[in-house]
């Protein structure tokens, strides 16, 4: 069984294994920088770790690959009979991480 971890970043949880590319909410940093994420759960073969004391000793390291943006979301506000309408767009900033190790 492969080793994987559940990490929490940006208010969301992601299942990651070594070598995975993951798009997460924006993390400040330059491409090539090392990022350390705290795991919520670690599975190493048949061994499952969820206790806070044991997880404090574990860490997930990742390399920041690039800063990018998500797909465009279009917002249109409209009020009937007044001629009011407003168009707006939004692209969420994202960070692409490559998981390099689970310790």
Curated annotation (Swiss-Prot):
Keyword Membrane listed: no
One Gene Ontology BP term is: translation
Which protein are we looking at?
Answer: Large ribosomal subunit protein bL21
Q: Which GO terms describe its cellular component?
A: cytoplasm; ribonucleoprotein complex; ribosome
This protein's source sits in the domain of life called: Bacteria
Give the InterPro entries listed for this entry. Answer: bL21-like, bL21-like_sf, Ribosomal_bL21, Ribosomal_bL21_CS
**Does the entry feature the keyword GTP-binding, yes or no?**
no
GO MF, one term, reads:
rRNA binding
HAMAP family, sorted: Ribosomal_bL21
NCBIfam families documented for this protein: L21
From which organism does this entry originate? Nocardia farcinica (strain IFM 10152)
UniProt KW keywords: Ribonucleoprotein, Ribosomal protein, RNA-binding, rRNA-binding
Sum up the protein's function in the record's words: This protein binds to 23S rRNA in the presence of protein L20.
Query: Which Pfam family, just one, is annotated for this protein?
Result: Ribosomal_L21p
Q: Which family does it belong to?
A: Belongs to the bacterial ribosomal protein bL21 family.
UniProt subunit comment: Part of the 50S ribosomal subunit. Contacts protein L20.
The record's section on PANTHER family has:
50S RIBOSOMAL PROTEIN L21, LARGE RIBOSOMAL SUBUNIT PROTEIN BL21M
């Amino acid at each position: 069984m492969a080793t994987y971890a559940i990490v929490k970043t940006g208010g969301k949880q992601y299942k990651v294994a070594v070598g995975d590319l993951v798009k997460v909410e924006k993390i400040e940093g330059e491409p090539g920088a090392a990022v350390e994420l705290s795991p919520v759960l670690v599975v190493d073969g048949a061994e499952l770790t969820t206790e806070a004391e044991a997880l404090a000793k574990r860490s997930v390291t990742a390399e920041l690959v690039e800063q990018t943006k998500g797909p465009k979301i279009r917002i249109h506000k409209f009020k009937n009979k007044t001629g009011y309408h407003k168009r707006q767009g939004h692209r969420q900033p994202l960070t692409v991480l490559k998981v390099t190790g689970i310790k």
